[in-house]
Amino acid sequence: MAAQAAGRPLRLAHRGVHGGALGHAENSLPALLAAVPTGCDGVEFDLRFSRDGLPVIIHDETLARTHGDERAVSELDASELQRLGVPTLTDALAALPDALFLDLELKVPPLPSFFAALRERSMDAGAQLVISSFDDDALREVGVRAPQWSRWLNVESPSAEVRARALALGVDGVSVEKSLLGSEWVADLQAAGLELAVWTLRTREDLAYLSHPGLVAACVEGEAR
């Protein structure tokens, strides 16, 4: 993964800069682009796949919460999703500055179009890019098809198997829920040589987590941006 920014953790706008005064919807193109003037080092966004197999930027399995539509993302073609305001990965890569660090969270295992979209944008070397996921199969597939890209295993709760999973997958690091920082469990993961990232910092008080030793990146939103 890219080095820390000037010796500090990278700050990644979680699902872009959404809500608040700007009113941008999470994971929308305006939200992703709004990360640039905030001074964030990069953006984090979620990826699923349309019915016609293209990577699209949305967190949930269905459109209900974000778009008021009960249909599943996988039931619609990418063009239909775009008309509803769901961008494709290609849309985002074309619009975002090359210098912006990208944390691409795969909600499901990737299809070939995912790798093609990134390679078309000359991101094959893996610079300024990390692939994160809670899904072991997704991380395993990326490791096989694009071993040059950094990978993080996302972790929500402590478990004795996480260290073994991470090492077996050969990931570069773990991205953990903020309340886990400072625990012996996290220290053990770092001692095993795994990079450490954290999610999601939302308040000014949460900014204290940025001083955690060895932290390389943090997903931020709201006051913590």
PLM features per residue range, with description:
Residues 1-225:
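Phosphate-group recognition and catalysis centered on beta-loop-alpha active-site segments
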